[in-house]
């Protein structure tokens, strides 16, 4: 990274560097940030924005931007802050990385930081009449300020931008989300095909979709806010309550981040068990995705078939973890208990049964003339768009984007197994559907290799020795893994509090589904309103993972 640091120093002489951590940290003043960001993307190839993390450092408010060069897989992070707590403002980078649009709105919602030149400076999760910004350290949580309201939000069509002219003057410009002549319909929040409480305000021209405004936050539970008053062990529980079809993966990611901060070496057997549980959960998730997508298109029979195989996986979870979905199995240093003696045999049996039924899934639906007509060529997301909107996982790979974290930044024991990264190139609903079925074959391939490794595993150490009271040193860490729907990222910051029951200073989850809904408008535009449901189903988002 030394050459990158030199180039950044040339581009921005005011930049400060810290290379002592895992990733190069670049601190820049806000007035230089946009120019540097443009150079980082266009000259240095940092074309992928992993996360925008808002942080209140008490003496300042700001963001940590995590960036990746998708060609070299180099990563760095940039810190930009302001000391103005009354009217905190930073310059937007949503014109450079489209994913920053929703992420900066989230930062504004929770920290009150306005982004100059952002096209739509509305809150994202909380009501428009919410008082205060909950993740600020000076937030007043008095329930009288924000009572439970049973009325609709006022002025939901109003938004604004802070526009900066060539002289640096910033003017607030009031705007409307939809024009007066647009015909807008509501899809959700209580609609079966939104797969939860999510709302699409949709502008249509005849049968064609012209614009989709995503309205989320109906089940926002404030997981990141609650984490500020929990110990690290207690935070593990809430990590499973986001994407319930990737519960083990989310918990695995948080454990890895804490273990990285403490320098804990996890026993080989424990990592092997973790990886097997991850892949079993990936299989279960892709089976559910198949069932839901077929149901959304009226194929009721096909919907029920994958539930038969999912029961095999849930039986394994229940027998070895004591629960079927939110297993609370990973812990800091390993797993909470060893697997049962017949675990490997059960996994092998499940792999054999699921593999035998994959051709049946294709026979039921993949060649159906109605399915082909509704999915082929609809909801197209190009590779460039996938990178720009930071859409990874199966959706990104269906657009030709090589983005599997298990390959690009191997964690756990993925560098010890042989598997293929499944990549398609059309980027339409059909490729997204087909890719998940193909990925199931690779998960089975990984699981069989893991079973062979378990047979040869010596000893039964399933957890490292860790302190009873977890205390992290002062610093910040970022960890990502490949979850069912894309990369889940965990940002963790500690202030080094010496108190016995130390709590995270800042814990942020960069959920894959939050990025997926960022392309709903893009993929649905100029498609038939009837196909909107199919397109969004092929994105395979989970509402609690969006809302957190």
What is each PLM-predicted segment?
Residues 128, 161-195, 203-548:
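Active-site bordering "gate/hinge" segments
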């Amino acid at each position: 990274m030394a050459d990158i640091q030199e180039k950044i120093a040339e581009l921005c002489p005011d930049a400060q560097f810290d290379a002592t951590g895992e990733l190069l940290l670049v601190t820049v003043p806000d007035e230089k940030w946009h120019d540097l960001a443009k150079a980082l993307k266009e000259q240095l190839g940092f074309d992928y924005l992993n996360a925008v993390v808002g942080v209140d450092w008490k003496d300042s408010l700001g963001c940590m931007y995590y960036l990746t060069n998708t060609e070299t897989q180099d990563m760095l992070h940039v810190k930009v802050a302001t000391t103005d707590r009354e009217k905190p403002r930073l310059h937007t980078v949503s014109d450079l990385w489209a994913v920053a649009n929703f992420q900066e709105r989230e930062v504004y919602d929770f920290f009150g930081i306005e982004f100059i030149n952002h096209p739509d400076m509305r809150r994202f999760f909380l009501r428009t009449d919410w008082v205060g910004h909950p993740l600020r350290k000076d937030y007043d949580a008095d329930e009288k300020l924000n009572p439970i309201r049973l009325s609709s939000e006022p002025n939901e069509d109003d938004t604004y931008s802070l526009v900066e002219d060539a002289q640096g003057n910033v003017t607030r410009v009031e705007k409307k989300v939809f024009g007066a002549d647009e015909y807008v319909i509501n899809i959700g929040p209580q609609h079966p095909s939104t797969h939860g409480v999510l709302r699409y305000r949709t502008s249509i021209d005849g049968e064609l979709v012209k614009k989709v405004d995503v309205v989320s936050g109906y089940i926002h539970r404030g997981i990141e806010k609650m984490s500020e008053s929990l110990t690290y062990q207690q935070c593990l529980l809430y990590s499973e309550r986001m994407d319930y079809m990737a519960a083990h993966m989310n918990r695995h990611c948080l454990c890895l981040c804490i273990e990285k901060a403490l320098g804990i070496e996890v026993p080989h057997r424990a990592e092997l068990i973790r990886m097997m549980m991850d892949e079993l959960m990936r299989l279960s998730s892709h089976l559910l995705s198949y069932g839901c997508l077929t149901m959304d298109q009226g194929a009721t029979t096909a919907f029920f078939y994958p539930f038969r195989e999912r029961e095999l996986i849930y039986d394994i979870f229940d027998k070895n973890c004591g629960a079927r979905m939110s297993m609370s199995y990973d812990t800091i240093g390993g797993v909470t208990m060893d697997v049962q003696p017949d675990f490997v045999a059960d996994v092998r049996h499940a792999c054999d049964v699921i593999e035998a039924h994959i051709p049946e899934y294709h026979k039921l639906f993949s060649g159906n003339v109605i399915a082909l007509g509704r999915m082929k060529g609809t909801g197209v997301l190009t590779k460039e768009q996938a990178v720009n909107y930071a859409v990874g996982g199966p959706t990104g790979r269906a657009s030709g984007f090589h983005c599997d974290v298990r390959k690009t930044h191997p964690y756990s024991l993925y560098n010890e197994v042989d598997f293929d990264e499944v990549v398609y190139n059309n980027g339409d609903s059909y490729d997204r559907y087909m890719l998940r079925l193909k990925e199931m074959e690779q998960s089975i391939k990984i699981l069989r290799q893991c079973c062979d490794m378990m047979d040869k595993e010596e000893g039964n150490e399933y957890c490292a020795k860790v302190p009873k009271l977890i205390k992290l040193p002062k610093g910040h860490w970022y960890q990502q893994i490949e979850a069912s729907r894309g990369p889940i990222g965990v940002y963790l910051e500690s202030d080094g509090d010496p108190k016995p029951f130390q709590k995270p200073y800042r814990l942020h989850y960069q959920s894959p589904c939050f990025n997926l809904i960022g392309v709903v408008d893009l993929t649905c535009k100029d498609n038939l309103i009837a196909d909107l449901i199919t397109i969004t189903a092929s994105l395979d988002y989970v509402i609690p993972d969006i809302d957190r």
